[in-house]
Amino acid sequence: MAMAPSSSLPQVYPSHVVVAVWEWQDGLGIWHPYSATVCSFIEQHFVRQRGQHFGLGSLAHSIPLGQADPSLAPYIIDLPSWTQFRQNTGTMRSVRRHLFSQNSAPGQGIVWEWLGDDGSWVAYEARICDYLEQQVARGIQVVDLAPLGYNYTVNYATLTQTNKTSSFCRSVRRQVGPVYPVTSDIAVPRQMGLICFCQQCLHGSGTGPVSGRYRHSMTNLPAYPAPQAPHRTTTVSGAHQAFAPYNKPSLSGARSAPRLNTTNPWAAAPPVAGNQSLFHSSLSHLGPQLLPSGPSTSSGASASFPSGPSSSSPGSAPTTVPVQMPKASRVQQALAGMTSVLSAIGLPVCLSRAPRPTGPPASRPASKSHSSVKRLRKMSVKEGAPKPEPEQVIRKYTEELKVAPEEDCIICMEKLAVASGYSDMTDSKALGPMVVGRLTKCSHAFHLLCLLAMYCNGNKDGSLQCPSCKTIYGEKTGTQPWGKMEVFRFQMSLPGHEDCGTILIVYNIPHGIQGPEHPSPGKPFTARGFPRQCYLPDSPQGRKVLELLKVAWKRRLIFTVGTSSTTGETDTVVWNEIHHKTEMDRNVTGHGYPDPNYLQNVLAELAAQGVTEDCLEQQ
């Protein structure tokens, strides 16, 4: 039964006492909170085990949810991987931990729910519950959920939720129950030196967390055009302060081909507050297959959770989590010499040239608010433009050296004075195995045949990137699948940017088939958590970042297809090294506001991908 909210709910929560809410993510990217009782059980395990070194599948670090709620007997949470695992089906779901003030809705045991078509009540995610509670406490009877990425309004007077596009209504209610657990493990993120374990920071390469990646609010990221942005690589002394992206490997298959990195992505400390929030948006252009069953959609589909917690017969606690990462084949090992260099410094592993993007599916015409990004569906390479020959690209950006320097080629790991390690794998009439050259801007030296092999394993778009310092030659493009980017604006301010409104970016990428530039050409790929909502301040610098993100989207640089480092799922769409703010406030996870250095840092990340203000002048 719905109850009136407390009128004493403050607008800002000054208390340092916090409560923890654990949520799981369904296949459509929607987050669902566990009950307060289950959250208390999970939190006890989490606080007790933080700081320990986890082993994948260790019983000590697997939380059997059936011990807290018998209806959840098939489910366990594996803390090292931040994953909920269903034993009888093998389904894996991401989980996250959010911290709220003790004066918030979760801290008072308040849960808002909506009525599904099957007559069951479904809880909103905790952040929405808290937002609804704050707005109602201010005396707002009709609460618009647009700032959180939802196309709904909630009317407190009539206790209904209305789809703003279809006018379809559902009943809602406000319940008061047990409070969520108070936690002593706040772990407020520091400004510098803290490793980030989010999906954006854990690349789709399946190589685990980056040991030493800078935090989002890091203050000393190098400004463009400094090429040596710190990533997972380690600096070594030398004439050019080059980067050593991996230890010198043992030989397998082709000469000097490094072994593919198959590091366990779960063998690391978990994030403080889970993964980034991925909010649902039922914008009318989205196909019904991309819309979750709740909150309400125009089709009125029933709410269901096919792979999340559900009623089942009780079972015993598991002993292991049967998760297996794919093993590297000999072909992958041979390719690693060219591609692991790029993946190690935060670039997607590309196997061939990018496919020509296909036209978008039939949908309604874009409104005026959409028109500014509709053109981003097209690739930056003009239709029918001839692609240069690979040897021509290498010659264009290099100078041949008569005498090879006394150093290693970091692509094949052989001395520059001896033949290229790819001489038995790459055929070229124009470039011999002993030919050595240096890149014209950064002066780093390589076997030209190694550069050719690296280029041929990429998009072959006429651009080249130095594997040592990341200097870009030409216009770099990525492997992002086809999708849609839309931009909206609303008046609510972001914390730290109270003098302006907010820009909402909605990315939507559907499931599809991988092209020749992806890890498994011809096979399907998944796109979890779309549409994804991201936030920028509507300030001059925020608008500049927006325009550069449009360029990055056009060049297919924002997402790629790879292995999720949080769930281990292969052939799925993952972020590609350009960090986005997916939460509006409470910057506990590093993906919200306030963050005074975010705009400066994302400009540096865009510059590292070759997207600078000069690109705007060329448009």
Curated annotation (Swiss-Prot):
Q: In which pathway does it act?
A: Protein modification; protein ubiquitination
Record remark on domains: The WWE domains are thought to mediate some protein-protein interaction, and are frequently found in ubiquitin ligases.
Task: Kindly give the InterPro entries that the UniProt entry links to this protein.
Answer: Deltex_C (IPR039396), Deltex_C_sf (IPR039399), Deltex_fam (IPR039398), WWE-dom_subgr (IPR018123), WWE_dom (IPR004170), WWE_dom_sf (IPR037197), Znf_RING (IPR001841), Znf_RING/FYVE/PHD (IPR013083)
Gene3D superfamilies, alphabetically?
A: 3.30.390.130, 3.30.720.50, Zinc/RING finger domain, C3HC4 (zinc finger) (3.30.40.10)
Q: Does the keyword Zinc-finger apply?
A: yes
Q: Does the keyword Zinc-finger apply?
A: yes
Q: What is its EC number?
A: 2.3.2.27
Residue positions of the PTM Omega-N-methylarginine? R255
> GO molecular function terms here?
transferase activity; zinc ion binding
Q: Which residues carry this modification: Asymmetric dimethylarginine?
A: R213, R215, R232
Tell me the protein's name: Probable E3 ubiquitin-protein ligase DTX2
Record region (Disordered): 243-271, 283-328, 355-389
Source organism per entry reads Mus musculus
**Annotated disease:** Recurrent site of retroviral integration in murine B-cell lymphomas.
- Main localization (coarse): cytoplasm
Q: Might you name a Gene Ontology BP term for this protein?
A: protein ubiquitination
UniProt feature coiled coil, ranges? none
Q: Fill in the subunit field for this protein.
A: Homodimer. May form a heterodimer with other members of the Deltex family. Interacts with NOTCH1.
- Please write the reaction equations for the catalytic activity of this protein: S-ubiquitinyl-[E2 ubiquitin-conjugating enzyme]-L-cysteine + [acceptor protein]-L-lysine = [E2 ubiquitin-conjugating enzyme]-L-cysteine + N(6)-ubiquitinyl-[acceptor protein]-L-lysine
List compositional bias (Basic and acidic residues) regions by residue number: 380-389
Gene Ontology cellular-component terms listed: cytoplasm; nuclear membrane; nucleoplasm
Query: Composition bias, kind Low complexity: at what positions?
Result: 283-318
Q: Which PROSITE patterns match?
A: WWE (PS50918), ZF_RING_2 (PS50089)
The protein's role, per its UniProt record: Regulator of Notch signaling, a signaling pathway involved in cell-cell communications that regulates a broad spectrum of cell-fate determinations. Probably acts both as a positive and negative regulator of Notch, depending on the developmental and cell context. Mediates the antineural activity of Notch, possibly by inhibiting the transcriptional activation mediated by MATCH1. Functions as a ubiquitin ligase protein in vitro, suggesting that it may regulate the Notch pathway via some ubiquitin ligase activity.
Location within or outside the cell? Cytoplasm; Nucleus
